[in-house]
């Protein structure tokens, strides 16, 4: 049978924001410039098709974009979006050379895009936090300055889910070409929970779809300010799988990682446990605050032994901003329903681990079983602020605890009576950066393979590619390996595709198999 040529389908919008690599040494101007060759190599390795180029970290970023990065990205087949910071982020450092003159920025970027067709548009960070500056009238001037030079120049504001509503869109609809929505759990600002990601993406999609606006979902691959730690590899994995499902269903038109690190070394500032790598954390993010009486807790059932003498030594710490008042939050330890220890969150220095020893004999004598609970409780006040506390290295006498050192997530249950109190065993991962990189590479290349086969492969292969994607989205690693093996065998036996196409897809399958072997 004669092999038919198939046109290449348009690449899916799989992107990355910032996380740029810098040259190891400064140039003659004293600045470490963007390391374009290494950055392009990493983006290609990841399978990135769209890169949000942040102009902020160095005064030479604009010139590096114009003279080095854009031509290299064009040759590599990568589309570029200039990412600008708003006035709220420009108090100390501005985007050079035009600062907060965004009319000048749009004019300059529009002119540059006439020379580089892969320069697609502009993304404005934290747009909804700067509406007093970005009035519809001013945004119209920005847009006009760019469109006058290049009518195809696009503007996608970066907006959070909580600001996406019909009244807002009614004012700005004619000024947007699409929206970038960064997921951080809505009003409960964190990078620990993903349970509402797909619901928020679906609702935002329906709202924007009525206006004819595409939605790009951005998920955190690195630290969000005022949170306990970087998002775990597991969090990034869940976020990307949810994003791929939304992309597959057509609810979003693109998926982007927020600051995916491309150099891999331990993030030692995240190693905050008293001993080892893990500790029990209770976190209240900035946003809607718990009311007095609201709480989160870490609990374990215990069975006191027959010794008749019971003690507990434990370690605890607090992290909070300066505006937290004394008396608003307390840490507690309970036996059953009785509070046996309490201390104000502000007692002691920030991040300082303190040791406490309690005599629990009066509370445990004669009991066959009960519970040990550590709590974070709001006592009074209503001011919104973020904070978190930690417990670690519990040394019991007269009873046993499972994973008293919090080096494993099991053994402890986390509960709260308010969604703004988030509990989790946080375990420092010295290989987090590499693991997140490999997870992203696997996800992106899987979707590329699925997209290419579903667009131009014969029906039997399309079904197998869809099965492979569903296994990835479902987190079923063993099924993915099996699906890849079956797909490879089917390709080797196929006689309807050009040999070059078969070889390309087989090479992609082999690459995915290697990634899964390294980071299962």
Protein language model features and the residues they cover:
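Glycan-processing catalytic domains of CAZymes
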Residues: 2-269, 418-455
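Short carbohydrate-recognition loop motifs
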Residues: 269-295, 422-429
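Short beta-strands within extracellular/lumenal beta-sheet-rich domains
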Residues: 284-308, 353-357
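Extended, low-complexity, turn-rich repeat/linker tracts enriched in Gly/Pro/Ser/Thr and Asp/Glu
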Residues: 291, 305-307, 317-328, 379-383
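Extracellular carbohydrate recognition
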Residues: 293-295, 326, 378-400, 429-432
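Extracellular beta-strand-rich recognition modules
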Residues: 310-318, 368-378, 392, 406
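Extracellular carbohydrate recognition and processing domains
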Residues: 335-368, 379-382, 410-412, 424
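Soluble extracellular-acting proteins and domains
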Residues: 450-520
């Amino acid at each position: 049978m004669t092999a038919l040529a198939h046109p290449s389908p348009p690449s899916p919008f799989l992107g990355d924001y910032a996380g740029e690599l810098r040259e190891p040494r400064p140039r003659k101007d004293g600045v470490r410039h963007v390391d374009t060759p290494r950055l392009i190599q990493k983006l290609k390795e990841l399978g990135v098709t769209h890169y949000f180029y942040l102009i902020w970290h160095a005064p030479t970023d604009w010139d590096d974009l114009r003279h080095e990065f854009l031509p290299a990205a064009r040759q590599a087949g990568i589309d570029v979006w200039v990412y600008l910071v708003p006035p709220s982020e420009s108090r100390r450092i501005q985007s050079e050379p035009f600062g907060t003159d965004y009319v000048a920025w749009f004019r300059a970027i529009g002119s540059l895009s006439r020379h580089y067709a892969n320069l697609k548009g502009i993304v404005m960070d934290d747009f909804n936090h700067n509406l007093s500056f970005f009035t519809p009238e001013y945004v119209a001037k920005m847009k006009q300055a760019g469109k006058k030079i290049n009518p195809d120049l696009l503007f996608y504001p970066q907006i959070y889910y909580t600001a996406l509503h019909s009244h807002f869109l009614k004012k700005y609809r004619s000024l947007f070409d699409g929206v970038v929505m960064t997921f951080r759990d809505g009003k409960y600002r964190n990078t620990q929970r993903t349970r509402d990601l797909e619901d928020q993406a679906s609702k935002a999609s329906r709202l924007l779809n009525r206006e004819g606006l595409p939605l790009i979902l951005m998920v955190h691959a690195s630290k969000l300010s005022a949170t306990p730690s970087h998002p775990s590899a597991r969090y990034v994995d869940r976020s990307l799988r949810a994003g791929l499902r939304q992309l597959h269903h057509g609810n979003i038109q693109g998926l982007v990682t927020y600051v995916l690190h491309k150099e891999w070394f331990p993030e030692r500032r995240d190693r905050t446990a008293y001993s080892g790598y893990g500790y029990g954390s209770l976190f209240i993010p900035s946003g809607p605050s718990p009311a007095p009486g609201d709480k989160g807790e870490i609990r374990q059932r215990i069975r006191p032994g027959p010794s008749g003498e019971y003690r507990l030594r434990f370690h605890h710490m607090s992290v909070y901003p300066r505006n937290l008042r004394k008396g608003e939050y307390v840490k507690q330890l309970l036996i059953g329903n009785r509070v046996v220890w309490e201390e104000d969150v502000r007692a002691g220095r920030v991040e300082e681990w303190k040791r406490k020893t309690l005599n629990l004999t009066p509370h445990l004598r004669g009991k066959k079983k009960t519970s040990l609970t550590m709590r974070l409780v709001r006592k009074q006040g209503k001011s919104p602020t973020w904070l978190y506390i930690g417990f670690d290295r519990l040394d019991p006498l007269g009873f046993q605890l499972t994973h008293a050192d919090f080096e494993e997530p099991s053994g402890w249950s986390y509960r709260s009576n308010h969604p703004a109190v988030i509990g989790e065993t946080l375990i420092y991962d010295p290989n987090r950066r590499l693991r997140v990189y490999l997870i992203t590479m696997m996800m992106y290349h899987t979707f590329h393979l699925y997209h290419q086969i579903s667009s131009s492969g014969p029906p039997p292969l399309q079904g197998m590619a869809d099965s492979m994607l569903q296994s990835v989205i479902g987190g079923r690693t063993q099924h993915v390996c099996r699906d890849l093996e079956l797909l490879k065998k089917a390709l080797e036996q196929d006689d309807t595709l050009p040999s070059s196409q078969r070889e390309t897809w087989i090479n992609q399958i082999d690459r995915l198999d290697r990634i899964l072997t390294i980071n299962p």
